[in-house]
Amino acid sequence: MTGLFVGSTDAYGGKSLICIVLGLKLKRDGRNVGYFKPLGLLPARIEEQTVDEDAAFIRDVLELPDPLADLSPVLVTEELYRRAMTKRAGLNLADRIKEAYARLAQGREVVLVGGVGAVPTTGRAFGLEARRLADLLDCRALLVGKYESERSIDGILVSRDALGERLVGLVLNDVPADQLTFVREEMVPYLEDVGIKVFGALPHDPVLRSVSVGELADHLHAQVLCCPEQREQLVEHFIVGAMNVESALRYFRRMPNKAVVTGGDRSDIQLAALETASKCVVLTGDLRPSSQVVTRSQELRIPLLLTREDTLTIVDRIEWLLGRVRIREQAKIERATELAQEHLDFEALLRELGL
């Protein structure tokens, strides 16, 4: 059995995305693949248990039969950090992880082990940072490096040093289109010169960085005034509608797959947003829209999200959400699979793993 730990240079760097697309490829190839997330950071109530939300989602995507309790045996909470800091006995985290992994790995050819947070740091308080987990489970390690700028090289090198000989190679993620040539012609050769094998670079993609209308409504604690069946629609761009209606119409028409954020008293901007194929309209200030706006949104099946906060606060909360985008919707999974098939050399990775 081969175990592959998937970690990243930063939180929200693309670990789950890589686990999903690699897991689906292995299943298409007829391999018996499993998924394991030793540390969970997203507690959620599922099937009357408190489990890691990411682990439960990936289990469903890969159609795995394993019990949720085994998929992510340790949930990282504030209480766990307090217990670690006060050196209270009885944590036994490494034993719990190793025992759950042994049960899950039985009969499997490959187990993908999802990391959390950033490779060099997350889990250190418990002695369960990425390298320690890879050693504990005897896994090779694949690093996902989210590209921010040329300085991203520093985080990659620090993570390389942390993983040591466990590292099998690197996948670069979220590379802007205008940086792809630099990455392929300069950054990748440099990384390979310093001993890091690169299996490809995924370009930035607006679908993968989008959020669903439902996710947006939940995060903003918004009341969905109409069209709740459109919660799965994906929003790629956000526009604050603070201009006059003529300028708004010109601007809105140039921006596809958008959400417009505007005051609840701006019926003119709301109607302009509805008439230019927006994915939703976010109304701020707890001001309900006019009956004309509600009727038109129902006719066009475009949700209206009513929020209590002012526009500036809502924009801040949306920006926070955009920095923590997760793969949840089927459209994102399909797009990620397409990009991986085009830009990643998974065959080379599997050869490195002896598969």
Q: Residues of each region from the PLM?
A:
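Conserved catalytic-core segment of NTP-binding enzymes
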Residues: G115-I196, D265-R328
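Phosphate-binding/switch loop-helix module in NTP-utilizing enzymes
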Residues: R82-A125, R131-D135
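Fold-independent oxyanion-binding glycine-rich loops
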Residues: S8-T9, P38-L39, L71-V74, G114-G117, ...
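N-terminal phosphate/diphosphate-binding loop that engages ATP/GTP or pyrophosphate donors
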Residues: G3-R96, A100-R103, Y190
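Flexible, charged surface loops at secondary-structure boundaries
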Residues: L104-G107, L249-K258, A273-A277
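Structural motif
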Residues: G3-L4, N32-G34, A56, E109-L112, ...
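Non-catalytic interface/targeting segments
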Residues: G115, A201-T262, E319-L355
